[in-house]
From Swiss-Prot:
This is Phosphoglucosamine mutase. Keywords: Isomerase, Magnesium, Metal-binding, Phosphoprotein. Mg(2+) binds at S107, D246, D248, D250. InterPro entries: A-D-PHexomutase_a/b/a-I, A-D-PHexomutase_a/b/a-I/II/III, A-D-PHexomutase_a/b/a-II, A-D-PHexomutase_a/b/a-III, A-D-PHexomutase_C, A-D-PHexomutase_C_sf, A-D-PHexomutase_CS, Alpha-D-phosphohexomutase_SF. Its EC number is 5.4.2.10. Its cofactor is Mg(2+). Binds 1 Mg(2+) ion per subunit. The gene is glmM. It comes from Dechloromonas aromatica (strain RCB).
Length: 450
């Protein structure tokens, strides 16, 4: 059964257009509340409670009120925390023993988009079957709980401080960051009032950029998806390294002292390489988009590697199935399940810095064992749900591309789970060949989608 509203990371879209409207979000909250009531194993007389956080988008205030109203109408208690990173909501949901956590965010997207994503009581993304149960109730009539049974709403005042202390607890007690000058780019997003404090309190000399949100500038030429600002700031401040988060702080990119950028594959490798020195690493999970060089570098360390579907939720599922701890995406979602239940940009950066402290040297030296293969990714706009597999011209061009690579690389064609895009990715040893093959295939997709 396909999902009508949920993508790979919750419900997302343009604010004011279906489904990101106040009416829909209220019904989403109500349906989620009823689903929680139906599945709750709480003692009789108790009622479930949820945590609602958001990033810094202006539309977050409107959607927060709608979501709050929906849960209250269903008879579910609501705890509000205001702007807070997505992984902070996951942590606090678990720490406060609540039944679900909800984040109002469109992650790395521009301010005019927004979305809703859910976490379970364990701080993990909801399973597909629970999302389907929520979807099934969205289009049903709302029946408000009796006045005496409406959910109460309260604000958690110490949420920021609790999460800062949690992040610090994931860094080794016998290490600190004294002597390091670090530039941190918070993308004018949810970590603007948190990330600088974490690294400062651990001893680093911190320079902050992207920490002046105005509701409209989230991810605007800053953050993990626009790292040029960070590269320039690292060089201008003569910093040792830079850290870039996205709007909801669940993904990470880093920059060394020379302005070289490192993606999720490289940072995951640094963490795993360091951890493997102290204890065996059973395996690492990536995705279909993970660079082949990561797989080959891990093989040299005798560490198995497996690919999940794109989306950090599927990486988590694979890690759980295999009993592994480490995984991630090249986009910067990095998982260390012995530290957190979900991808966390701040926690991941701390794990890289711990590796840097334990192994010595610079960030560039730390990542010297992994040279990425050239990879070309082209996003082609298409109608949502575009059936590309039914277009002979596309499937034929895809097959021709695979033949042309002659085993020297790979090609991937997949629909985005969050945007109306078809992603064309070609990877191989020769950069010129890779670029040519990707552009040729993308041109066929573009023509077929018209």
């Amino acid at each position: 059964m396909t999902r009508k509203y949920f993508g790979t990371d919750g419900v997302r879209g343009r604010v004011g257009q279906s489904p990101i409207t106040p009416d829909f979000v209220m019904r989403l909250g109500y349906s989620a509340g009823k689903a929680l009531l139906g599945r709750s194993e709480m003692p009789a007389g108790d009622r479930p409670a949820v945590l609602i956080g958001k990033d810094t988008r202006l539309s977050g205030y409107m959607l927060e009120s709608a979501l709050e109203a929906g849960f209250s109408a269903a008879g579910v208690e609501v705890c509000l925390v205001g702007p807070l990173p997505t992984p902070a909501v996951a942590y606090l949901t678990r720490a406060l023993r609540l039944q679900a956590g909800i984040v109002i965010s469109a992650s790395h997207n521009p301010y005019y988009d927004n979305g809703i994503k859910f976490f379970s009581a364990q701080g993990t993304k909801l399973p597909d079957e629970v999302e389907r149960a929520i979807e099934a109730g969205i289009d049903q009539p709302m029946v408000c709980a009796p006045p005496a049974d409406l959910g109460r709403v309260r604000r958690i005042e110490d949420a920021r401080g609790r999460y800062i202390e949690f992040c610090k607890s994931t860094f080794p007690n016998d290490l600190d960051l004294r002597g390091l000058k670090i530039v941190i780019d918070c993308a004018h997003g949810a970590a603007y009032h948190i990330a600088p404090s974490v690294f400062h309190e651990l001893g680093a000399d911190v320079v902050s950029i992207g920490v002046q949100p105005n509701g409209l500038n989230i991810n605007d030429a800053v953050g993990a998806t626009a790292p040029k600002a960070l590269c320039e700031a690292v060089l201008a401040n003569r910093a040792d390294l830079g850290i870039a988060l996205d709007g909801d702080a669940d993904r990470l990119q880093m920059v060394d002292a020379e302005g070289n950028l490192y993606d999720g594959d490289q940072l995951l490798y640094a963490i795993v390489r360091s951890r493997a020195r102290s204890a065996p690493v059973k395996g690492v999970a990536g995705t279909l988009m993970s660079n082949l060089a990561l797989e080959h570098a891990l093989a040299k360390l005798n560490i198995p590697f497996a690919r999940a579907a794109v989306g950090d939720r599927y990486v988590v599922e694979m890690l759980s199935e295999k009993g592994w701890l480490f995984g991630g995406e090249n986009s910067g979602h990095i998982l260390a399940l012995d530290r957190h239940t979900t991808g966390d940009g701040i926690v991941a950066a701390l794990q890289v810095l711990a590796a840097l402290r334990e192994l010595g040297g610079s960030l560039k030296e730390l990542l010297g064992g992994l040279v990425l293969y050239p990879q070309k990714l082209i996003n082609v706009p298409v109608m949502r749900g575009f059936p590309w597999k039914e277009h002979p011209a596309i499937t034929s061009a895809l097959a021709d591309t695979e033949v042309s690579l002659q085993g020297r690389g790979r090609v991937l064609l997949r629909a985005s789970g969050t945007e109306p895009l078809l992603r064309v990715m070609v990877e191989g040893e020769d950069a010129v060949e890779v670029t040519y093959a990707a552009e040729k295939l993308a041109a066929v997709v573009r023509e077929s989608a018209q």
